[in-house]
């Protein structure tokens, strides 16, 4: 039940860097809507990171796309990543425990966190499904 290899052990002992995805779906602020969708789809995570000059500018989630379509209808097709993204996405350090990442995602009602290193560089994404 409390075996380190079990789900509780994984949650308590595992670090974010051990579970993060490192093949990241990345777009730029001026990427058009259709290309954003393609990048999100190819990444298979339901998100795209908006990066410029190696800096994280925002994140686009499936929810952001749905809200944009609901609010703007067909005009959404003319939007860019900068207009769709959530600025200042939630981040977590790669050496934090996975349990902390899961707790943060539950608290913020989000499904993914951007993972950063000591230099604040983006190094991955970690997902949580409830």
What are these regions (language model features)?
Residues 63, 69, 84, 88-90:
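Extended hydrophobic/aromatic segments used for targeting, binding, or gating
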Residues 65-79, 130:
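A short, polar/charged loop-to-alpha-helix boundary motif
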Residues 26-44, 69, 91-110, 115-119:
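The conserved cystathionine-beta-synthase
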Residues 1-17:
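YjeF_N-associated NAD(P)HX repair module
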Residues 40-43, 48-64, 105, 113-129:
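A glycine-centered beta-loop-beta connector
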Residues 12-24, 78-89:
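Bateman (tandem CBS) regulatory domains
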Residues 89-92, 126:
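Structured cytosolic domains appended to multi-pass membrane proteins
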